[in-house]
Amino acid sequence: ARTTAGSYRRYRRRCCSPRRLYRLRRRRYRSSRRRRRRPCRRRRHRRVCRRVRRRRRCCRRR
Protein backbone atom coordinates (compact mmCIF):
# COMPACT_ATOMS: atom_id res chain seq x y z
CA ALA A 1 0.00 0.00 0.00
CA ARG A 2 1.13 3.52 -0.78
CA THR A 3 1.50 6.13 1.95
CA THR A 4 -0.39 9.33 1.18
CA ALA A 5 -0.37 12.46 3.30
CA GLY A 6 -3.87 11.70 4.57
CA SER A 7 -3.10 8.16 5.69
CA TYR A 8 0.11 9.38 7.29
CA ARG A 9 -1.80 11.96 9.27
CA ARG A 10 -4.36 9.36 10.28
CA TYR A 11 -1.57 7.05 11.40
CA ARG A 12 -0.06 9.73 13.59
CA ARG A 13 -3.41 10.53 15.12
CA ARG A 14 -4.02 6.86 15.88
CA CYS A 15 -0.58 6.59 17.38
CA CYS A 16 -1.06 9.35 19.94
CA SER A 17 -4.72 10.07 20.35
CA PRO A 18 -5.32 11.59 23.81
CA ARG A 19 -7.84 8.90 24.72
CA ARG A 20 -5.40 6.11 23.96
CA LEU A 21 -2.57 7.81 25.81
CA TYR A 22 -4.85 8.29 28.82
CA ARG A 23 -5.83 4.62 28.77
CA LEU A 24 -2.20 3.52 28.56
CA ARG A 25 -1.21 5.87 31.36
CA ARG A 26 -3.99 4.58 33.61
CA ARG A 27 -3.05 0.96 33.01
CA ARG A 28 0.62 1.69 33.61
CA TYR A 29 -0.11 3.66 36.77
CA ARG A 30 -2.25 0.85 38.18
CA SER A 31 0.30 -1.86 37.43
CA SER A 32 3.44 0.00 38.50
CA ARG A 33 2.23 2.26 41.30
CA ARG A 34 4.91 0.99 43.67
CA ARG A 35 7.63 0.91 41.05
CA ARG A 36 7.16 4.49 39.88
CA ARG A 37 8.43 6.21 43.03
CA ARG A 38 11.80 4.49 42.95
CA PRO A 39 14.59 5.97 40.82
CA CYS A 40 15.37 4.15 37.59
CA ARG A 41 19.10 4.01 38.13
CA ARG A 42 18.88 0.41 39.28
CA ARG A 43 19.51 -2.17 36.59
CA ARG A 44 16.18 -3.82 37.18
CA HIS A 45 14.17 -0.70 36.26
CA ARG A 46 16.32 0.66 33.47
CA ARG A 47 14.65 -1.47 30.82
CA VAL A 48 11.19 -0.35 31.91
CA CYS A 49 12.11 3.33 31.62
CA ARG A 50 13.48 2.91 28.16
CA ARG A 51 10.33 1.20 27.00
CA VAL A 52 8.14 3.96 28.42
CA ARG A 53 10.26 6.67 26.82
CA ARG A 54 10.06 5.00 23.44
CA ARG A 55 6.28 4.78 23.63
CA ARG A 56 5.90 8.44 24.52
CA ARG A 57 8.05 9.60 21.63
CA CYS A 58 6.10 7.57 19.10
CA CYS A 59 4.43 10.47 17.26
CA ARG A 60 7.24 12.97 17.26
CA ARG A 61 9.62 10.51 15.66
CA ARG A 62 7.32 9.53 12.77
From Swiss-Prot:
Testis. One of its GO terms (molecular function) is DNA binding. Proteolytic processing into mature chains is required for histone eviction during spermatogenesis. Transition proteins (TNP1 and TNP2) are required for processing. Its main location: nucleus. GO terms for biological process: cell differentiation; chromosome condensation; spermatogenesis. Keywords: Chromosome, Developmental protein, Differentiation, DNA condensation, DNA-binding, Nucleosome core, Nucleus, Spermatogenesis. It comes from the Eukaryota. It is found in: Nucleus; Chromosome. GO terms for cellular component: nucleosome; nucleus. Belongs to the protamine P2 family. Protamines substitute for histones in the chromatin of sperm during the haploid phase of spermatogenesis. They compact sperm DNA into a highly condensed, stable and inactive complex. This is Sperm histone P2a. It comes from Equus caballus.
